Every structure is written in C-alpha cells, then in structure tokens.
Curated annotation (Swiss-Prot):
GO CC annotation: cytoplasm
Uppermost EC category: isomerase
Recorded name of the encoding gene: tig
Alphabetical list of NCBIfam families matching this protein: tig
Taxonomy, superkingdom: Bacteria
Keywords: Cell cycle, Cell division, Chaperone, Cytoplasm, Isomerase, Rotamase
EC identifiers of the protein: 5.2.1.8
Pfam families per record: FKBP_C, Trigger_C, Trigger_N
Gene Ontology molecular function, alphabetical: peptidyl-prolyl cis-trans isomerase activity; protein folding chaperone; ribosome binding
Record protein name field: Trigger factor
Length: 434
C-alpha cells in the first residue's frame, strides 16, 4: 500500500492511497470462498455450487464490499502511521476501478490545528471580592416577600413598582403601526418590559384617566421600521394595583422549608443559598475573563467541520428549549449560531491544549466537591450524589467541568490578577449580563 499526504488549503488535507491489485484479488477470493459455503442455487447442494457460478452471481457485490472495506481500513492505518488527526467525516473519492490493476483513491478532510499557547502571562483578570452582608440578606427577604405578594386595587397615582391594566394605541405621524395596539394589557412596572419612556409616562396618573405618552424607539429596536422613530401612545388607564407584602409569619416562613418557622432560620437558609450563588458567580466571572483573555492572546485556525458540528448541537438545544424536534432544529438558520459555534470550538481547542500540555487529569477530590456542591441545593443531597455516581454520562460531564476548572487555575497562575471589592447585587447583575 502506497500513501501520500498533502495539504490542500489551510487545515485541509488529502490522503492518496494505492491498493495493490494482488491485495484486492486476495480479499475478493477469500470472500467468494466464504459465500460459496452458504449460497443456495437451484440444482446444486449447499456448499457445492461451482466457484465460477458464485463469482458470476455475487462477484460484483463482493468486489464493492471489499473495496469499501479496504478503503476504510487502509485510511485508518494511513492516518495512524502519519499521525494525522481528522475533524469530522472524511470525504472518500475513489478513481475508476479496473480489474487486475492497482486501485487508487483519495480521502479529503480537515485536521485539528497545531496550537502553541502564548502570552498567557498577558491575560488580565479582575477577581471580585464580595461577602454576603446582612443588608444583602434583607434585600433577598424583601424579594421573597414581593414574589409572594398579592395585588390590591389602588386609588392613588401610579408609582414605580405598581401594576397597571391599560389599553394603548401607538401611532407615528398619525399612522398606527403593527404591534402598537393592545387592550386590557397588564404591566408590572419596573421590569423594563416596555420601551424607554412608556412606564415613566404612566407614573403620576390615576385609574380612569386617558392621556397620551410621547416616546422614541431605541436605535437598536428589533423592528427595522421603528428604529429611532418618535411615536405617541394613546393610553386608557383602567386599573392601578399595589403590592400587599406578606408578613414574615411562622406560616409564611414554613413555605420555604424552614421547619421551626423562625425568622433566624429563614435568614440562615437564605444566607447559605446566597453564599453558594456568590461562589458560583465569582467562579463564573473569573473563568469568563480567563477565557476571553485566552482567546484574545491566541489566534486559532478553526476547522469548518468542527464549527458545522457545533452549529447542529446549538440548533438542537434551541429547538428543545421551545419544544421542537430534530427536523425543526435543523431548519433553524445556521447563521444564527455560527459565531457562537465558532467561539465554542476555539475555546474548546485552547482549553484542550492547556489540559494536554500540562498533562492534567480530573482530580477525584474536585469531582466529588463539584457533585456535593450541586447536591447541596436539593432537599436530599445524598440522593442526588447517588444519582450522579450511577450515571456515567453525568459523571463524564462533571469530570470535564473539573478539568476546565483546573485549566483555568493553571492559566491564572501566570495571569495578571487584581482584586476589586464589589457587592453581591452588582456582581450578580454582571454575571447575568454576561
């Protein structure tokens, strides 16, 4: 078998393989002999069919099978011997086969790029320094009360955190526009659901009033025909409601799993949950900066096949979130996911190189700690730990997460790390905004 490897373009490779005619004939003869022992042809006993007849009837089928098998096996041997690492499915390109002659075919594919990490010491990371304070716990308790609040009719003016029911009709230069009209629209104020100026225009008015609000659509508004346009909304304010917050009674507190129903017990549980969230948020913030710096410091040739594969993963994930199936997933526009897929491939390649070059292995203690941390958020942590330990796929996911953490720590060891004091709310907002 003769093998040649050449670069087509960038990460593209072409392997050309020549299979000697003798090897093909030997394999064909062997398969025909096997077939002769089992084929049934009228007029002949099983295993006594003449070879010439077996060859006449099954020769072409056997030849095709042999060529397909030889192409695959020889290609695998060739890439192992030449230490080539393909990405994605290879594209086989056979030449015309002529009986008695050597068979030539080529295989085209992409390879993973060779990566030499550089400038890791130039990566800058700001590590948040945060503690959960009493006032943070107070704010979280207030949030819990708001989530459990009841809405009561209000006779006074609309305030920033009220809820209103309105009819509205929008127009631009006197002309109505699509999506600008609604009746009995319920709006909880202060959540940023409407365009700038809409909620502000409601504040100070009372139920039963009719008035007009002037607004300007943002330049980055999703509807092209409305970007930057000035509009007027005719408002009929039908109802104003305000929250009636529940008191921190024993009954209320027990809803959150606090057996003794005490305020101290609730505060302790809330603080514990906030500290767990804080730990994850700090880890996420630091990791995000490390990865951003890693990508910025290292240019990587990206295999198109790897990006294509990642796009399909993202398509399926998006479809699953909205209850779609496999067919619907692949109909989603690929360009929606291309940039995200490309970045994920780049990050995977770079972190993979950090792991390989430092010969990192997932540490058992870290894997256990990650599982324990996830389990601590559930009512019965031991049950969750057991579930993870019995599921090999979940365990592999945790091991990969542990390896990523170890890789990030390896980069941090040489990065420029500074500390910055901040507060719980600011950090959580930063993490949520990405």
């Amino acid at each position: 078998m003769q093998v040649s490897v050449e670069t087509t373009q960038g990460l593209g490779r072409r392997v050309t393989i020549t299979v000697p005619a003798a090897d093909i004939q030997k394999a064909v003869d062997s398969e025909l002999k096997k077939a002769a022992k089992t084929v049934r042809i009228d007029g002949f006993r099983k295993g006594h069919v003449p070879m010439s007849m077996v060859k006449q009837r099954y020769g072409m089928s056997v030849l095709n099978d042999v060529l397909g098998d030889l192409m695959q096996r020889n290609f695998i041997n060739a890439i192992i011997e030449n230490k080539v690492n393909p990405v994605g499915a290879p594209d086989y390109k056979p030449e015309q086969y002529k009986e008695g002659e050597d068979f030539v075919y080529s295989v085209e594919f992409e390879v993973f790029p060779e990566i030499e990490l550089k400038d890791l010491e130039s990566i800058e990371v700001v590590k948040p320094i945060v503690t959960v304070k009493d006032e943070d716990v107070d704010n979280m308790l207030e949030t819990l009360r708001k989530q459990q609040a009841e809405w009561k009719d209000k006779e006074g003016e609309v305030a920033a955190e009220d809820r209103v029911t309105v009819d509205f009709n929008g127009s631009i230069d006197g002309e109505e526009f699509e999506g600008g009209k609604a009746e009995d629209f319920v709006l909880a104020m202060g959540q940023g659901r409407m365009i700038p100026g809409f909620e502000e225009g409601l504040i100070g008015h009372k139920a039963g009033e009719e008035f007009t609000i002037d607004v300007t659509f943002p330049e980055d508004y999703h509807a092209e025909n409305l970007k930057g346009k000035k509009a007027q909304f005719a408002i009929n304010l039908k109802k104003v409601e305000e929250r009636e917050l529940p008191e921190l009674t024993e009954e209320f507190i027990k809803r959150f799993g606090i057996a003794d129903g005490s305020v101290d017990g609730l505060r302790a549980e809330v603080r514990k949950n906030m500290e767990r969230e804080l730990k994850n948020a700090i880890r996420t913030r630091v990791k995000s900066q490390v990865i951003d710096g890693l990508v910025k410091a290292n240019e990587v040739d990206v295999p198109a096949a790897a990006v294509d594969s990642e796009i399909e993963v993202l398509q399926r994930q998006a479809a699953q979130r909205f209850g779609g199936d496999e067919k619907q997933a692949l109909q989603l526009p690929r360009e929606l996911f291309e940039e995200q897929a490309k970045r994920r491939v780049i990050v995977g390649l770079l972190l993979g190189e950090v792991i390989n070059s430092n010969e990192l292995k997932a540490e058992d203690e870290r894997v256990k700690a990650l599982i324990d941390e996830m389990a601590s958020a559930y009512e019965d942590p031991s049950e969750v730990v057991e579930f993870y330990n019995k599921n090999e796929q979940l365990m592999n996911n945790i091991r990969n997460l542990a390896l990523e953490e170890q890789a990030v720590e390896k980069i941090l060891a040489t990065a420029k790390v500074t500390e910055k004091e901040t507060n719980f709310t600011e950090l959580m907002n930063e993490v949520q905004m990405g």
